């Protein structure tokens, strides 16, 4: 899907080098196509890296996507310049009167805090409430998934004894679901988190289904019955070197961090990572865009 991105967005250089099809605003304007309008709530501190990761996954289909990035006003970013946010981001107040075909809520490194103690929690709750009537389908990632399950369904998160860190094997638990069309019987996805949601809490809610899970990592993909909300507990969007960079960062900070499981060749950091989740990640996001956004959204928003 050609994505329409602003001129000079830092992600453009990386996407071009990776042969990901995107268009500048002028070319997109001259195409007689109604783009899918996707709002991306970027909660990650490394916003530019996350922009590239998300755009890479929504940029591989014949339809046109118009992404809108928003950041939370109630949190001051320490890792992204004010100039970048002004140039490439909106706030919720600026977009709340619009409707969107889809929404993506990223993860955030705040999982050890209670939801209510996150400084932008009230603002995020307003975004969640707004999405019920203004967004066709939302995909939530990692902490964003835990936050969405808590807000919409009252499902709590629990702290793990040690960080879940690595690439884990998953199996489908529901096969006749559009979101998982084309998935292998077994597939891999990265996880990097300190908290989890209990399977039994999800299963108690008749409006939710666990579509895929892992013996080691637990519930992975959860969907509401109508497909309006998708919750992905891992990080399918991660670059090949993301876990390695996290490992090096934590090690340099003197943390007692184990090497990420099933990630380095022969479990040897010197041999580098082996990417086993790229195909799954692309299929997950392309299925969501096609079956839950494009096929379901009203043509006129």
UniProtKB/Swiss-Prot annotation:
Keywords: Acyltransferase, Amino-acid biosynthesis, Cytoplasm, Methionine biosynthesis, Transferase
Role of this protein: Transfers an acetyl group from acetyl-CoA to L-homoserine, forming acetyl-L-homoserine.
MF GO annotations: homoserine O-acetyltransferase activity; homoserine O-succinyltransferase activity
Protein name: Homoserine O-acetyltransferase
Organism the protein comes from: Clostridium acetobutylicum (strain ATCC 824 / DSM 792 / JCM 1419 / IAM 19013 / LMG 5710 / NBRC 13948 / NRRL B-527 / VKM B-1787 / 2291 / W)
EC number(s) stated in the UniProt entry for this protein: 2.3.1.31
Localization (cell): Cytoplasm
GO biological process, one term: L-methionine biosynthetic process from homoserine via O-succinyl-L-homoserine and cystathionine
UniProt-annotated binding residues for substrate: 163, 192, 249
Disulfide topology: none
Gene name for this UniProt entry: metAA
Residues at the catalytic site: 142, 235, 237
């Amino acid at each position: 899907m050609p994505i329409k991105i602003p001129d000079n967005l830092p992600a453009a250089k990386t996407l071009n080098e990776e042969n990901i099809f995107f268009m500048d605003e002028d070319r997109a304007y001259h195409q007689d196509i109604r783009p899918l309008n996707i709002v991306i709530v970027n909660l990650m501190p490394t916003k530019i890296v996350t922009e590239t990761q998300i755009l890479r996954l929504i940029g591989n289909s014949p339809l046109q996507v118009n992404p809108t990035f928003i950041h939370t006003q109630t949190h001051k970013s320490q890792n992204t310049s004010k100039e970048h946010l002004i140039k490439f981001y909106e706030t919720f107040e600026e977009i709340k009167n619009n409707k969107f075909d889809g929404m993506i809520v990223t993860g955030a490194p705040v999982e050890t805090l209670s939801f209510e103690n996150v400084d932008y929690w009230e603002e995020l709750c307003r975004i969640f409430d707004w999405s019920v009537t203004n967004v066709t389908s939302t995909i939530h990632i990692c902490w964003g998934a835990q936050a969405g399950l808590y807000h919409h369904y009252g499902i709590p998160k629990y702290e793990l004894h040690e960080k879940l860190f690595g690439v884990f094997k998953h199996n489908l638990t529901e096969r006749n679901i559009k979101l998982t069309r084309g998935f292998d019987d077994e597939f891999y996805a990265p996880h990097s988190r300190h908290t989890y949601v209990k399977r039994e809490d999800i299963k108690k809610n008749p409006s939710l289904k666990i579509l895929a899970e892992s013996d080691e990592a637990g519930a992975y993909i959860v969907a509401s019955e109508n497909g309006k909300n998708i919750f992905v507990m891992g990080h399918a969007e991660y670059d090949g070197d993301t876990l390695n960079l996290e490992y090096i960062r934590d090690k340099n900070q003197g943390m007692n961090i184990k090497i990420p499981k099933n990630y380095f060749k022969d479990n040897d950091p010197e041999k580098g990572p082996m990417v086993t989740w790229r195909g799954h990640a692309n299929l997950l996001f392309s299925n969501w865009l096609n079956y839950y956004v494009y096929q379901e959204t009203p043509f006129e928003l």
